């Protein structure tokens, strides 16, 4: 390249670096930065000149030099460790062999900084440093925003040890570039621990390019409890139900939790209780849990003459691990091993049947918040469950055998999928869409079937209206917030399913569809009181359970948290 162009560029870059040096004395790299930070400016700006006088002034040497161009042959990066250099080279490859100016070099630096941002290095900056360009080779310097000191301040009443906080933050290594993805994950894993409230701040440290992290861990209420009243039951099992829940956060001061839940239905026709415990294992977000539950029922209504009663005992072990843990995107891997022991009696005729269902489930739970179409929230859940039904009494096992029985005895597999989307439409209007699916490998026991009716399905029908082996449920809601406390919504529900995966040769068509529509209201007020109400009319045939048809059908729930 001509020596005059080379010298002019050197002058331009040098003058730019001098301005940056005045702005941030002590910085190791001088020049034009690109990144989340703004470009360096002189500490003291000169007084503004009169416009007429300015027109007569000659063009400053730096401006003239900045317009000098040369053919770019290569770009070299210094200070790179957080991202592959090949990606940086790919970002600037389109400029190689072209004539460039200082302004073009600043664009190259901005492109390189964008690569860092995509990798989560929000504090990284890319500079055009002071240099003399030889043979078209330009050097870009990177300040990656390395982590300096990590300071942890623990409130005296915080139910957590300093070691657990420090080990959870260990993914953030001092001396290495501060990655925003790792930073979010570490802080969210801390916030997932019950009983504490972590806060953090990043500040510029003393060493060049280093950033110090300060983490403050406060305490939350250790005991949380709530009450819920609803009409989700049926006429035969007790329509109105009262549920109480209690959580003891971090009882062993390790981020664990102990939970108790009890429910009693109207007339004590149904009673349920569950105790569970969950604890973190290691410091990467893995949690292991276990629970014991018991349910008892006594059916009334038309079944009363037979005096039907039942008992179910359930034990389970579970785990959860966050594959992705970010503010906008989360992906959890979850698994469960459970054992159900069920006894049903018809005391009036002296008949008892006993069953055991045990199995293993593995699933994924995904959620994401985005700005598409004005903003929205998406969730996806999938689980594959492999289980086995053992019918313990000979009489029931005999009548389960084909061709007169449905052959539920033995191993089975079922897949369940759920998807939902909440989408912004207008300042006071949003759309919610939800769908659920179940597919089975064979005929299932009633305890493993999918219910097409109820408050979480087609709301114009009772819980247990249609129990299916294979089926789907879909809903759409148009939501309109009346104020900060109340939201009115209109909905339409639909479902379809086959009561048995494989019907008997002489069975009629056992598939059924349900439709319903209606209005609902969600209301909450300060003091942790929440009320949910839905009123639904059926769009298909009359209901066959819960005493027949109810039109409209009303579901409501009142919750109070303490």
Regions found by a protein language model. Give the residues of each.
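Periplasmic polypeptide-binding modules associated with outer-membrane biogenesis and secretion
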Residues: 2-4, 24-233, 245, 263-271, ...
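Strand-connecting loop/turn motifs
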Residues: 121, 195, 220-222, 253-255, ...
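Transmembrane beta-strand segments of outer-membrane beta-barrel domains in Gram-negative
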Residues: 280, 285-438, 442
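Transmembrane beta-barrel strands of outer-membrane/channel proteins
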Residues: 202, 227-231, 260-264, 290-294, ...
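Outer-membrane beta-barrel translocator/receptor signature
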Residues: 208-211, 222-229, 235-260, 264-277, ...
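Residues that define the transmembrane beta-barrel architecture of outer-membrane proteins
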Residues: 209, 238-242, 269-273, 311-315, ...
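Residue-level signature of outer-membrane beta-barrel architecture
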Residues: 217, 248-250, 279-281, 321-323, ...
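C-terminal transmembrane beta-barrel domains of outer membrane proteins
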Residues: 400-562
């Amino acid at each position: 390249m001509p020596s005059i162009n080379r010298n002019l560029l050197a002058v331009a870059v040098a003058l730019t670096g001098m301005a940056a040096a005045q702005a941030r004395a002590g910085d190791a790299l001088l020049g034009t930065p690109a990144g989340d930070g703004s470009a360096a400016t002189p500490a003291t700006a000169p007084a503004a000149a009169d416009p007429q006088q300015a027109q007569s002034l000659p063009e400053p040497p730096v401006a003239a030099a900045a317009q000098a161009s040369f053919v770019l042959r290569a770009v070299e990066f210094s200070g790179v460790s957080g991202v592959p250099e090949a990606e940086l080279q790919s970002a600037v490859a389109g400029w190689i062999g072209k004539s460039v100016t200082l302004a073009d070099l600043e664009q190259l630096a901005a492109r390189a900084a964008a690569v860092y941002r995509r990798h989560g290095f929000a504090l990284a900056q890319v500079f055009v440093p002071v240099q003399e360009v030889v043979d078209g080779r330009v050097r870009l310097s990177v300040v990656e925003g390395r982590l300096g000191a990590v300071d942890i301040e623990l409130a005296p009443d915080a139910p957590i040890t300093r070691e657990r906080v420090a080990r959870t933050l260990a993914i953030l290594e001092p001396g290495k570039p501060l990655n925003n993805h790792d930073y979010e994950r570490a802080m969210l894993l801390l916030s997932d621990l019950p009983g504490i409230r972590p806060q953090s701040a990043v500040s510029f440290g003393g060493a060049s390019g280093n950033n110090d992290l300060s983490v403050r861990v406060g305490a939350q209420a250790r005991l949380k409890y709530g009450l819920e009243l609803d009409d989700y039951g049926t006429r035969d099992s007790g329509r109105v139900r009262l549920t109480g829940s209690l959580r003891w956060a971090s009882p062993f001061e390790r981020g664990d939790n102990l939970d108790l839940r009890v429910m009693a239905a109207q007339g004590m026709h149904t009673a349920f209780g569950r105790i569970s415990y969950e604890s973190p294992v290691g410091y990467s977000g893995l949690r292991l849990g276990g629970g014991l539950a018991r349910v008892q029922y006594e059916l009334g209504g038309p079944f009363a003459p037979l005096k039907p009663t039942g008992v179910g005992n359930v034990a389970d072990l579970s785990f959860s691990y966050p594959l992705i843990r970010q503010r906008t995107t989360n992906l959890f891997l979850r698994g469960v091993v459970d054992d159900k022991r069920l006894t049903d009696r018809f005391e009036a005729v002296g008949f008892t049947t006993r069953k055991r269902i045990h199995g293993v489930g593995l699933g994924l739970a995904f959620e994401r918040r985005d700005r598409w179409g004005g903003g929205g929230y998406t969730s996806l859940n999938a689980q594959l469950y492999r289980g086995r039904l053992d019918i313990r009494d000979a009489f029931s096992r005999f009548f389960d055998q084909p061709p007169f029985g449905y052959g539920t005895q033995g191993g089975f597999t079922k897949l369940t999928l759920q998807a939902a989307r909440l989408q912004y439409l207008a300042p006071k209007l949003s759309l919610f869409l939800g769908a659920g699916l179940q597919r089975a490998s064979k005929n299932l026991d009633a305890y493993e079937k999918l219910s097409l009716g109820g408050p979480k399905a087609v709301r114009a029908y009772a819980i247990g209206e249609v129990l299916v082996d294979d089926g789907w449920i879909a809903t759409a809601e148009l939501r309109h917030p009346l104020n900060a406390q109340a939201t009115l919504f209109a909905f339409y529900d639909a479902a379809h399913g086959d009561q048995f995966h494989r019907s008997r040769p002489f069975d009629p068509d056992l598939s059924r569809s349900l439709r319903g529509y209606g209005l609902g209201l969600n209301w909450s007020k300060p003091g942790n009181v929440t009320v949910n109400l839905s009123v639904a009319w059926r769009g298909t045939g009359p209901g066959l359970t819960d005493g027949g048809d109810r039109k409209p059908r009303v579901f409501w729930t009142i919750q109070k948290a303490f």
